């Protein structure tokens, strides 16, 4: 009977880590591919100084990240491609791993506290859109 040496243990550990890494990647890809959600933020009117929105932006980034969110776009230069009406002056698109993560972010106490800052200087429309698998 052969005994395991330190070398065997290291090799088996590396194989185990490799399998775990592949499984984590597959799980993350499957979750994103099947359940991603995108939050579209539109600033409709500005009622206070721009510094209020800058303060909100600094606070909100960490909160979004805490819930697995990532900003895909932020812009103050938006173009109306079809339809009528005014184009929101500022827009953002945030991706989340799932609709549940987006809802948890939005309803979290941290985000609701930050929203008070946001709302003190503007009105917004915020919509969650289910991603395509």
Predicted regions and their residues:
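Helix-centric, low-specificity signal for extended rod-like, repetitive segments
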Residues: 1, 20, 36, 111-112
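Bacterial N-terminal signal peptides that target proteins for export
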Residues: 2-15
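Single-residue recognition of alpha-helix capping/boundary positions
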Residues: 8, 101, 110-111
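Short S/T/G/P-rich N-terminal loop/turn motif that feeds into the first structured element of a domain
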Residues: 19-103, 130-133
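Alpha-helix boundary/capping and short turn/kink residues
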Residues: 50, 108-111
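A short, aromatic/hydrophobic, helix- or strand-capping loop or linear motif
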Residues: 68, 115-122
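Short, exposed beta-strand-loop hairpins at the edges of beta-sheets
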Residues: 103-106, 113-118
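C-terminal end-helix/capping segment
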Residues: 119-133
């Amino acid at each position: 009977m052969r005994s395991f040496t330190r070398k065997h243990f290291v090799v088996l550990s590396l194989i185990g880590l490799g399998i775990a890494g592949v499984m984590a990647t597959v799980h993350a890809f499957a979750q994103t591919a099947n359940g991603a959600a995108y939050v579209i933020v539109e600033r409709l009117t500005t009622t206070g100084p721009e510094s209020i929105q800058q303060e909100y932006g600094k606070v909100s980034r960490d909160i979004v990240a805490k819930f697995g969110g990532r900003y895909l776009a932020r812009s103050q230069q938006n173009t109306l491609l079809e339809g009528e009406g005014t184009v929101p002056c500022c827009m953002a698109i945030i991706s989340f791993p799932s609709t549940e993560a987006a809802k948890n972010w939005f309803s979290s106490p941290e985000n609701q506290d930050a929203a008070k800052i946001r709302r003190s200087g503007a009105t917004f429309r915020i919509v969650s859109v289910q991603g395509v698998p």
